[in-house]
Amino acid sequence: MVLQDDALALGDQVQEVRRSERLTESACCLVNAQGSMSTTLQRVLRMNTPDFEMQKMILEINPNASLVRRMAELASNPDNNRFIQECGLQLHANAMIMAGLAPNGNEMAARLQDFMLQLASQKA
């Protein structure tokens, strides 16, 4: 369910969202599709070719990560769908940063502020 929600939220930003068989601690990571150029080569091409578009990557989700497990629990309540999708978008942004890529800073900052506001409103 969480994988489907993340895939819907990300739309065409990634080639695929799939379960990771290799991650043990991280919640997610971005990997290149088989046969595609390395991320480093794509970054170099993008710097030298203004209209170069990065190839879509695969977002691998670790189903055993505590955040992903909690998202799966929350998914049983449809009222949580928006929150789960926002978490999926943030996981993708986190994975982009870990891969040395730049996510949309304005969207990420707004999302993080919303998360912080939700947490702050739960404090006494």
Positions of PLM-derived features:
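Long, intrinsically disordered, charge-dense linkers/tails
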Residues: 1-124
